[in-house]
């Protein structure tokens, strides 16, 4: 079991988040978590990603973020995360969840992002049971990117049938 210090309501749009995240990591949280796509602007999303990696480097922690989790092909937080992981030399220490917008990416952009994921040694966790859009698992595998399945929701509003059974997801 790992404890994730998670920015539930955004970094920029929720004042005081930085202090809460520091406190959680000082208390021993194992992973730094973010959700940059819920910020209001592209600049705020980029700052969110940067701040999460700043904490990861400061505390020597892995990163786990919910990215591009909406049906909007214009979302770019998965790319931002991969680039940041590469620039910080955080290879193999970053995990991206959902990436539902990937289902709508044009193929050239998808291939660009897949190459970045591979370079960053980043894994994408797809949760296909919680909505009609999901990460392009087969295409990611064909591009040589790392993918796994997850169960994000257990008996909640998003998926009230979740029972923490990975066979349901498979």
Q: Where are the regions that the model predicts?
A:
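Active-site core of metal-dependent hydrolases
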Residues: 4-17, 26-135
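His/Asp/Glu-enriched, well-ordered alpha-helical/loop segment
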Residues: 62, 83-94, 121, 137-170
């Amino acid at each position: 079991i790992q404890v994730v210090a998670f920015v539930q309501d955004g970094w920029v749009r929720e004042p005081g988040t930085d202090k809460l995240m520091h406190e959680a990591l000082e208390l021993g949280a194992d992973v730094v978590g973010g959700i940059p796509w819920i910020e209001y602007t592209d600049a705020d999303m980029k700052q969110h990603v940067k701040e999460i990696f700043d904490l990861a480097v400061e505390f020597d922690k892995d990163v786990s973020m919910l990215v591009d989790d909406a049906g909007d092909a214009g979302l770019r937080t998965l790319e931002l995360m991969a680039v940041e992981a590469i620039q910080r030399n955080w290879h193999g220490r970053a995990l991206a969840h959902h990436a539902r917008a990937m289902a709508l990416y044009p193929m050239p952009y998808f291939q660009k992002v897949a190459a970045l994921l591979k370079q960053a040694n980043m894994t994408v966790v797809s949760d296909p049971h919680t909505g009609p859009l999901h990460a392009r698992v087969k295409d990611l595998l064909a591009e040589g990117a790392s993918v796994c399945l997850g169960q994000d929701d257990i008996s909640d509003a998003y998926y009230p049938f979740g029972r923490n059974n990975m066979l349901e997801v498979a």
